[in-house]
Amino acid sequence: MARKLKTIMDGLTFGEGPRWYQNKFYFSDFYSHKVYSLDLNGNYEVIVEVPNQPSGLGWMPDGTMLIVSMKDRKLLSFKDNLLKEIADLSELAGFHCNDMVVDVHGNAYIGNFGFNTYAGEEVKSTNLILVRPDEEPCVAADDVMFPNGTVITGDGKTLIVGETYAARLTAFDINDDASLSNRRVWADLAESVDDGNVPVPDGMCLDAEGAIWVASPSTAEVIRVREGGQILESISVETNAYACMLGGDDLKTLFICTSNASGVDPDSALREKSGKIEIVEVDVPGIGRP
């Protein structure tokens, strides 16, 4: 039976970076520069405005919100209504910074485009960046093809990142010092389909069975994938799916950020405001974190 999607917020420019934290749903709206919280009835609050475009979100152990500032390639904190620079990522990021996952110790892993998508530059690899609390940023992994959505397993031992332009999910062991090792392919999405309609990973989230829900804008769907690449389920959307997160009281509500926009045309996204937050109920709960 097809699952039924419901729109709980529309009129957005480009929703991204969805997170479920302390029984609330949060996300960034790129081109309005706003970070929102939102409930299941569509009631929302603007948490903060980020002048250089917010993207990935996370929280420190003390509850301080972390926000990736895209265009100036910085990591910011937001606490007591004060937006503060934590780290300058510009030396390690090839172009705009994007998604982020933060572990229970406050270590932040941050992706970036690697090349200027707006100018049509040639695709090239880049770094996945690590920012430890109170330390300078460093390279967690190099030669990553557009590191995007990222999750950490419930035991805190494995990080999995979506490489958008390689159409794969790549896993690493997380060492005691938060560095990464033992790189391997977790799922090759190009090998997961036989019709040539290859999903590409954008935002994603982990469920309690260890499968990952992956938003794929290229195929207008979110897919549930297990290690090895088997696609367990697909939920189609009318436009493009850019990110997803499990939340709700039982952690079985899948929040999906959708938009007609391509992600490389800010003017169109601002003009059309086709972005939505859609929800759908699924069978397996999340784990309360990406």
Task: Show the residue positions of the predicted features.
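Flexible "stalk/tail and boundary" regions
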Residues: 22, 38-40, 61-62, 78-89, ...
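A short beta-strand motif characteristic of beta-propeller blades
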Residues: 4-9, 42-49, 83-90, 136-142, ...
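Short loop/turn segments immediately following beta-strands, especially the blade-tip
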Residues: 172-179, 282-287
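Blade-level signature of beta-propeller repeat domains, shared across WD40, Kelch, NHL, RCC1
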Residues: 246-290
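Conserved beta-strand positions in repeat-built beta-propeller and related beta-rich domains
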Residues: 11, 26-31, 65-72, 108-120, ...
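Loop/turn-rich, solvent-exposed surfaces of beta-rich toroidal or solenoidal domains
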Residues: 167-168, 172, 187-227
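Beta-rich, blade/repeat-based domains predominating
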Residues: 9-23, 50-69, 91-108, 114-115, ...
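A short loop-to-beta-strand structural motif that recurs across blades of beta-propeller domains
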Residues: 34-36, 74-76, 126-129, 168-170, ...
